[in-house]
Amino acid sequence: MIIIGRKSRNTDQALIKAGIELIAQGNYDPTVRAICTLANVNQGMFVYYFGFKEEYMKVLFQKIYEDYLSKLQDYPEKDAKAAIQLQQIFYRMTKYFIENFNTANFLTEALYHSKAASYFTNYRVQHFIFVRTLIEQAQREGDICSDMNSYEIYTTLQSILIQPIIIKNNIL
């Protein structure tokens, strides 16, 4: 009788958790060895689950981005006017970026500046579409000026959002 091994449900999650921890520490391009050491998993299991590091990084990014989106969308004022909802979302964005500075940097790098950015095209607009829809609704409700388009308003609000992060992390 031949016994074929089954994939453990926890090993792949341990590898993802290790990657998230390394990124939170500022290691945006962790080695397979570092990931496996932190996860207490041998490197053969890394290959078994993900094949190549590039595939692992895609899965890791997807997990981090989905967690970020869920934090943005999990606010108590969902029945409120759009302007109130925007206030809640930008508060959550600011809080996330301050509390998870290195992870936020990783997301920014992956979304816009990394060699892998093209893989994340489907993701990089989800948060923008979500916020832009609320901006346009707030404009229709008369709570936000209508002489600017939603992208201009989004980038203006985004620049305001970044100020507490710069101050807290002594970037300038």
What do the predicted segments below correspond to?
Residues 97-116, 168-171:
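Amphipathic alpha-helical segments used for helix-helix packing
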Residues 69, 73-74, 115-141, 152, ...:
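Amphipathic alpha-helical packing segments from all-alpha helical-bundle domains
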Residues 73-102, 150-157:
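Hydrophobic alpha-helical connector segments
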Residues 109, 139-172:
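Hydrophobic/aromatic-rich alpha-helical bundle segments in the mid-to-C-terminal region
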Residues 14, 22-55, 59:
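Helix-turn-helix
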Residues 1-10:
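N-terminal intrinsically disordered/low-complexity leader segments
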Residues 10-19, 35, 60-64, 68, ...:
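Generic hydrophobic, amphipathic alpha-helix propensity
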